[in-house]
Amino acid sequence: MNINLVGIGLGNPELLTKAACNAISKSDIVIGAKRIVDSIRSDFVGKKFFLEYNTEKIADIIKSNAGSEISVIFSGDISLFSGGSKLFERLKAFKNCKINTFPGISSLSYLCAKTNIDISKVKILSFHGKDELLYHNIDSNEYTFIITSKGEGAKEICRKLISFGFFELDITLGENLSYDNERITTAKPGDFLDMDISDLNCMIIYNPDSDKAISFGLHDEVFARDKVPITKSEVRAVILSKLNISSDSICYDIGAGSGSVSIEMAGLAYEGKVYAVEKNPVAVELIKKNIHNFNAENIELI
C-alpha cells in the first residue's frame, strides 16, 4: 500500500510541485482538510476525496481502503508545523505500508523569498493554538518568523511587542500568500492594530539590535528592591553557575524575596518555566514589578 504525504504549498495550484502533482494524479483517494482539498479539487477530477484533518480519523480511512493508493495533503510543507509529521509516525505501525513524502513551499520560505531574507538567520515560532515566549525570542534573534492564530492573533502579538517596548521594530506581515489577494506589508507594531488582517497570515519581525548573549550576575541596582533582602550579584552568579540551568529547565525559587534569582533563572531557562514561591506580601509585589520590568513571561508567581 502506497501512502503519499503531500505538501501542496500555500494554496495556489501553480505552486504545487510536479512530483506532488504526479503523486496525487496516481492516487485513488485524496484526504485533507476542506480548505486544502478545495484548492486542488478542480485539477484532479475523478478522485475520491475525504475531508478530514484528524490524524486518527485519517488513519482509520486509510485502514478502510487498504488496497488503494492514497494521498494525504497538507498545506505548506510537511516538515513545518504540519500534521504530516504526526501522521508519518502513526503510519509506521501499519504493515506493508510504503510512506512517500513530497515537500511543498512553506509560508516561511515563500515570505523569506519575497522579502529577500536568508532563512538560516530566522528563528521560527508558532502561535497557532499555543503560546510561545515572545520577548526572549524577539530580543535575541535578528529575524523571528511567526505563524499566528487568525487576524486577531497577529494584532495580539503587536500589542505584546508594544508592551515590551519594541515600538520601532519592523514587522513584515504576509496575508493570503500565493492567492490573488495576497498582501505583504512592512510597518511598525502600532500600525497593524487598526488594520483588517486576514486569518491566513504570518509575519517576520526584524530586530537589528538583537543580543544572543546570555549572562548572569546582574547588578543589584537593576532590580526593584525596597526593604526586602536581595541575593547579591556575586552570590547569584555562583548559584546559577552551579545549577547548570538549560534552556528548557523547570526551576523553583523557594522564598524568592525580591525575585532576583527567579529573574536570572528565567533568562537562562527561556524555553522552560520558573516558579517563584513567596509568602511576604511586600516581596510578592516586588516580584511582580521585577517580572514586569524584565518581561519575564516564563515566571509563575506562587
Functional labels for PLM-detected ranges:
Residues K232-S247:
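Conserved alpha-helix/loop element of class I SAM-dependent methyltransferases that forms part
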Residues S258-Y270:
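Conserved SAM-binding loop of SAM-dependent methyltransferases across substrates and taxa
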Residues S107-S140, S149, G153:
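Short, glycine-/small-residue-rich phosphate/pyrophosphate-handling segment
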Residues N2-L5, E69-I70, Y143-V228:
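A contiguous loop/helix-start segment that scaffolds small-molecule binding in enzyme catalytic cores
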Residues M1-N100, S109, V274, E278, ...:
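Class I S-adenosyl-L-methionine
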Residues I24-D28, V45, N141-E142, L200, ...:
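Short, well-ordered alpha-helix to beta-strand connector turns
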Residues D248-G257:
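Conserved class I S-adenosyl-L-methionine
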Residues V284-E285:
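Short alpha-helix immediately C-terminal to the canonical SAM-binding loop
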